[in-house]
Amino acid sequence: MSSGYFERADPAGEHRLELAARAAWLYYFKGRTQEQIANELKVSRQIVQRLIALANAERLIRFQLMHPMAKCIELAERLRDRFDLVYCDVCLTESNNKDDTPSVATQATFYLEKVLDQVAPMTIGLGSGGTMREISHRLPPMDRPQHRCVSLMGNITRDGRATHYDVVTRLAERLNGQCYPFPVPVVTHTVAEKELLQAQPGYNALSAIVAEASLLVMGIGYWGPEATLYKDGFITAAELGQAMAAGAVGELLGCAISADGVIVGADYHERLTSFIRTQPADRPTTIVASGVYRAPAIRAALHGRLANSLITDENTAHLVLDLN
């Protein structure tokens, strides 16, 4: 239909913009199809397409997403831009508490489902802690025996007591995948004890698998009197205080970090057995965390490039952005 109104009119100037505005209004606001608009304006569908494209090019259209997730999408974009992240996902905060770990763990599970659904073999490095445990419980059963799950840190105290955060075994079980735990103390009694552990063939084999991991996923800890690393018995009160005096605001894989994302000069670090990250992160390294107390630690890790991906909730996202 090419001999209609549009062809008889002057296609240039203000009249063309008026037609573009009308076509865009019918398409976006009234929900008409391009065929319906073509019949109403007495032009071809091809011209309707050009008119809508012109309306967009001339910025005649402004979109507003009317959904609660819109603010989460905006927060994720702001975090991505602020910290130059390779991935960021912000979920709705469904709790009135200062910590909404269940929602964040669920969101992280959706992310891992998509990543782990691939057929090609992959290795994923996993941190420890309550948030990671929540993720391992939420992941649905998947038959991926070709995938490998490797722990990035130990889960034993100096006196031999294990924690309840056996994340790697649980997640590998859900995947029907290969499991590589790290059954050593998080912090040893002495440097010599740590060096003895690192000299074992099993440690070197595990270290090689960690180096091959294409994705690292971990929680992050608050640093203070209620710090998980201290409450679970991995470090002493004196070690906690010494790191705090050195400027620690958070903990990543057992490592105390400052507000600038720098690993502080904590004495226990020379006895820490976890696989310390490179700085900046050299592969997708995702922090999954929620809570007002963790916000300074999250901001520090992202600012210091210890991690380059984040999954969190909207309240925590606001706090991290405000801290910057």
Regions found by a protein language model. Give the residues of each.
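Short Gly/Thr/Asp-enriched flexible loops that form oxyanion-binding sites at enzyme active sites
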Residues: T131-M142, T228-A238
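A generic structural motif
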Residues: P145-H147, G177
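Structural beta-sheet core signal
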Residues: L126, C149-S151, P181, I287
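Conserved phosphate- and dinucleotide-binding cores of soluble alpha/beta proteins
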Residues: S2-A24, Y28-I37, K42, I47-A53, ...
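Generic hydrophobic alpha-helical segments
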Residues: A23, V104, A108-L112, I135, ...
